[in-house]
Amino acid sequence: MSDMAERLALHEFTENAYLNYSMYVIMDRALPFIGDGLKPVQRRIVYAMSELGLNASAKFKKSARTVGDVLGKYHPHGDSACYEAMVLMAQPFSYRYPLVDGQGNWGAPDDPKSFAAMRYTESRLSKYSELLLSELGQGTADWVPNFDGTLQEPKMLPARLPNILLNGTTGIAVGMATDIPPHNLREVAQAAIALIDQPKTTLDQLLDIVQGPDYPTEAEIITSRAEIRKIYENGRGSVRMRAVWKKEDGAVVISALPHQVSGARVLEQIAAQMRNKKLPMVDDLRDESDHENPTRLVIVPRSNRVDMDQVMNHLFATTDLEKSYRINLNMIGLDGRPAVKNLLEILSEWLVFRRDTVRRRLNYRLEKVLKRLHILEGLLVAFLNIDEVIEIIRNEDEPKPALMSRFGLTETQAEAILELKLRHLAKLEEMKIRGEQSELEKERDQLQGILASERKMNNLLKKELQADAQAYGDDRRSPLQEREEAKAMSEHDMLPSEPVTIVLSQMGWVRSAKGHDIDAPGLNYKAGDSFKAAVKGKSNQPVVFVDSTGRSYAIDPITLPSARGQGEPLTGKLTLPPGATVDHMLMESDDQKLLMASDAGYGFVCTFNDLVARNRAGKALITLPENAHVMPPVVIEDASDMLLAITQAGRMLMFPVSDLPQLSKGKGNKIINIPSAEAARGEDGLAQLYVLPPQSTLTIHVGKRKIKLRPEELQKVTGERGRRGTLMRGLQRIDRVEIDSPRRASSGDSEE
C-alpha cells in the first residue's frame, strides 16, 4: 500500500462525509439567509443577471443565457433545477414580489410547471430586484471566491427591506426544513420602523401592524388571530386559506383560490364527488376563467331550494378550496447558524444587518469623499502656483518627488496634478474645484454626523424604509377573515329534501311515493296483500321500522323503490329475527321526543334519533317481557303534557309524561300496574296510550255510546306513575278516545 494512503475507519469516514453533506445542504442550498432572504441559487441568479446588465429597463434576453452564466460562473449544478428556481422567481402567482420579469410562457396558476424551456423564454430583472442590488457596489457586501476561484461573488446581497418575510421561501435540508410565508411589504416596513422607534416593542404591538401572511392570491386567510399570534411567537404552525365565493343568479361563483391551488384540480375533485353521487344537489360545473377574470369557477345547484352555504362548507372540507399551509420560520441567522425564529427576532436581527449595511455604505462613501477632498486640496495648490508647477514639470526629470517636496504634497496629490490635461488649467476650473470641494465638505460633515449619532442613523434608516415602502409597496391581497371550521356533509345531509310518503303493506312490502297527496290504501298491491301503514316526511329523513321483538331499523327513503310499482320486501333490506314482523313505521325530526312502551305496562321516553340504526340487523330498542308486544310509538309535543294509559279492562291512569325516564333503549319504568296473573292469562294488558296537553277534554267511545270527560273529571284518574289505575263506571271496554285540547285541535289517536 502506498505511503500516501490514509487509513480511516469506515464508520468515521461515513459519519464525516454525511455530516459535511448535511452542512452543505443546510448552509449552501436549502435555507435562506436572514439578511437578503435568498438561498444561494436565487442569489446567484439575481447577481448573474445584474452582471449581464439585465436590469428592469434593459431589453429581455434568452433565459438560457442567464442559466448558462449562473452554472458556468457560480453554481455548478443541474441546469433544470437552476431554471426552475428562476421560473419561481418570475411567477406572480408563486412569488408575492417577483424578482424576475419574464416574457413568454412562464407557467400558469393551474399548472405552474407548464413553463416553456429556457431556450424559448426571455427574462430580465424586475423593478423590485433593485431593493437587493442597488447598494451592491458600495462596500456593503462581503465577497467570496466562486467554486473554481476565478471570480468573486457576493456572500449576501445588501437588501433594503426584509425580503426574508416579503417573499418567503420553502426548502428541505437534512434533518430540517423551512416554510416561510410571504408578507405585505408595507406592513413589514412599518413594523421595522416601529422597532427602530421603540426597540422594546412587544410581539403584540408588532402584530397590530403585521396582520399575518399575505399570499399572492385574494383568497381568505381564515386562521384565528390567537393561532396567528402563536405562530409568530413560536416560529412554527400552520394557516388555512379558503376560496372566495359569492352567489350570482342562483349559482356559486368562485373568484379566488388558495395559494398554488389549481382551478382545474378543484373542478376534478368536485366532479369526482358528483360521479360518485356524493353531491346530488349540484347540477353543473363550469370554468369561465379568462384574462379579465383569472379565476371564475361556477357551481350550479339543482334547484333554488339547495342551501349553497352548506354545500360550500362541505366542499371546503373535502376539496382544495380550503388548504392548510405549514409555517416554519427556519433560516440562517447573522451568526451563520440555522434557527427557527419568531417575528420579533427576525425583524430585530434584520435591523442589525441593515444598520451594519448602511454603516458600511456610509463609510465607503465617506472614504471616497475624503480621498477626493484630499486630491482637490492638491489641485488647488497647483492652480495657485500654476507657473511654478509647469516649470517643475518641464525642467525636472522626476517631477513627482520635486512637486511633493516643493509644495508638501502627498504622492496621490502629485499623481493627480501630473495627470491634469492642459485644458483643465483654465481659470474656470479653479471655480469648479472650489465648488466641488465645498459640496464634498458638506457631504463629509453630513456622513460623519450620521455615523457619529445613533439618532441620525435611525432617522436615515426610517426615511429609507418609508421611501422604499412607498415606491414598491402595495395593498394587502389576502384578507384575514376568521371563520368556523368547515365540516363535510354526511350522506344524510346530502340527500335532497323533498316531501315523500312511505307505504308499508301487510306482507311487509315497502315503497316510496313523491309528495304527501297520496292515496296509500288505493295503491296497487300484490294478490293477497293490502295496505298496512303510511308515514309522511322528507326524502333526507330516515324512515324507522320497529319489529315485534322491539328492534328498530332505519332506511333512507332514497334507497326505496318507487310507488309506481308494488315495492320490495323489507326482508331484502333488513335482517329480522326469526318469526319477527314489522309492526310500526315512523318519520320524525332527529330530536323529536317519543314514548316507547310495551303492553306489559312498561315504557320510556326517547328521541327519534335513538331509533335510527342503519345496519341491516338494527338495534335492540325496547326490552319486552315474555309474551308482551310493542305499543305504537307516541309523539310527545311538550314536556308539560300528560300521559293517559288505558288497560284492556278499562282501567285508566293519568300522570305527567315527564315522570318517565328518557333512555336510548331498555325496558323502561312501570307506566301502569297490570297483575302478572291477569297478564299471563291475557285478561288484562296496556291497550291504549295517549299524550295530551293539560286542560284537555276527552270524548270516550264505548260501543255506540260517547262519554265526555272534562279536565276536572279527569282528576279522578290522575295518580302516581305505576299505580293500578281507576276503573270508571260504564267504561269497561273503551274503543277509542278523542282529545279536545285548547292548544291542539287535532285528534290524539296514535294508532296507525
Curated annotation (Swiss-Prot):
What domain of life does the UniProt record list for this protein's source? Bacteria
Is Cell membrane tagged as a keyword? yes
What residues form the catalytic site here?
Answer: Y120 (o-(5'-phospho-dna)-tyrosine intermediate)
Q: Which residues form a coiled coil?
A: none
- EC class (word): isomerase
Say where the protein is mainly found.
membrane
Which residue windows does the record flag with biased composition (Basic and acidic residues)?
473-492, 732-743
Identify the stretch(es) annotated as Sufficient for MukB binding: 497-752
Query: Pfam families annotated for this entry?
Result: DNA_gyraseA_C, DNA_topoisoIV
Give the enzyme's EC designation.
Answer: 5.6.2.2
Asked whether the keyword Oxidoreductase is assigned, the reply is no
Q: Which CDD domains match?
A: TOP4c
UniProt KW keywords: Cell membrane, DNA-binding, Isomerase, Membrane, Topoisomerase
Q: Which GO terms describe its molecular function?
A: ATP binding; DNA binding; DNA topoisomerase type II (double strand cut, ATP-hydrolyzing) activity
Q: What is the effect of changing S80L?
A: Confers resistance to quinolones. No effect on catalytic activity
- GO cellular component term, pick one: cytoplasm
Query: According to Swiss-Prot or TrEMBL, what is its membrane topology?
Result: Peripheral membrane protein
Per its database record, what is this protein's job? Topoisomerase IV is essential for chromosome segregation; it is the principal protein responsible for decatenating newly replicated chromosomes. It relaxes supercoiled DNA. MukB stimulates the relaxation activity of topoisomerase IV and also has a modest effect on decatenation.
**What is stated as this protein's family in its record?**
Belongs to the type II topoisomerase GyrA/ParC subunit family. ParC type 1 subfamily.
Q: What is this protein called?
A: DNA topoisomerase 4 subunit A
Question: What is the organism lineage in this UniProt record?
Answer: Bacteria, Pseudomonadati, Pseudomonadota, Gammaproteobacteria, Enterobacterales
> What gene is it encoded by?
parC
